[in-house]
Amino acid sequence: MTKPKHRRGFRFYASIYRKILVQDLKSKMSYRADFIISTIGMIMTNLSGFVTFLILFKNFPSINGWDYHHMLFLYGFSLIALTPVQCFFDNNWNLRFQVQSGDFIKYCFRPINVFFYFMSEVFDVKGLGQLAFGVGTLVYAWVNIGIPVTPLVIAKLILFLLTASLFMIAIMNAAAATCFWIVGSGYVMVIMFRFKDFAKYPSSIFHGIFRILFTFVIPIAFVAYYPSLAILESESVPVLTWCAPALGVLFFYLSYKFWMLGVRKYDFTGS
């Protein structure tokens, strides 16, 4: 399916997003009990990771050179990096249902970018609980490690957190887009999302095959490990860490083009 291109400026899309976001939040706030319960569930899930490290490091002083606080730093970093995909791109989970039912066609006739329109319909506020927990964990680890707080370090932290976010967003975009070609593609989304659990561990602890897999095939190592080394390491920072920002933008762009390719190939129910 082809559709005319509509070029709009940032202010236009920001205005549209604000209006859609307000309506979505109003809808969610009408079910406050569900929101509170789901947010508590999100925090408890993340807390379990914290407790796991606490128990683990009571028995082992370090894992392949990573001590308790460095592992917590990586964990907090990964939680913050995963927040954008949780908050802003959660509608990817609904894509296959919209495609299978034929309801997705409604997005194809609006004079705005289909990808933007579809993603903007859902904002997962539970992700804010994850963000708060991630920030708390990162700050706690930061203080105990003794990382200096300078403008340069803060700038690197922001840059590499954004970089890490792009990788997970891209992974989920690509996984969701498979529904345009594969019937019952939900398992692809589930598998790719489960891989995020490996992001909280340093890539160096895995077997060589898995290091290659998580670096060059399914780049989970870029969701936290490689970007965080820009903050944790003052010397001997891997080349892949410095390449991460450019690779993140490229990977996100490719996932977006793949998603939009699916839109162009889309045949709605009854066509």
Locations of the language-model features?
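Hydrophobic transmembrane alpha-helices and immediately adjacent juxtamembrane helices
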Residues: 2-271
